[in-house]
Amino acid sequence: MIINETKGRVWHGHVELADTFIKRFRGLMLVSNVNHALIFVLPIENRLNASIHMFFMLSDIDVIWLDSMRRVVDFKTARRWRIYTPKESARYVIEGPVGLIRTLDVEEGDLISWDVTEKKEKSVPVKVSFPGKISFENERNTVVFSKDIIELP
């Protein structure tokens, strides 16, 4: 969810952080249906680092540039195969579906905040060693460990 704190407007959508070099490099390139927002956390606040390119993008997107205080310094709908640089230095760049700017009613100087959607971690199988010996007795639905007995329902 992304919130325009100044106007009390909310965009209810999936939000992810691009806070590593690889995530920022990948961005939304080659995403066919941009239906979520990506917030780029830049290492330093300046205009050059906040520049974006739209090469290899499959659709147009809305882009909002924020300073380190999360105030809007620039915003626009970015078209494919172009380069964009914000008017002022920026520390955060929000890329999202076209309509994001309109939904939030964004203007320069607005204070923007967000709530990142939690990603569920993938489960990874691991080997676990049990002390002692395990045997199964099917007739009584019992698992027998060498040290104790556990009755299963």
UniProtKB/Swiss-Prot annotation:
Pfam families, per database record: DUF192
Family that this chain belongs to: Belongs to the UPF0127 family.
Full protein name: UPF0127 protein TGAM_1372
Source organism of the structure: Thermococcus gammatolerans (strain DSM 15229 / JCM 11827 / EJ3)
Source taxonomy: Archaea, Methanobacteriati, Methanobacteriota, Thermococci, Thermococcales
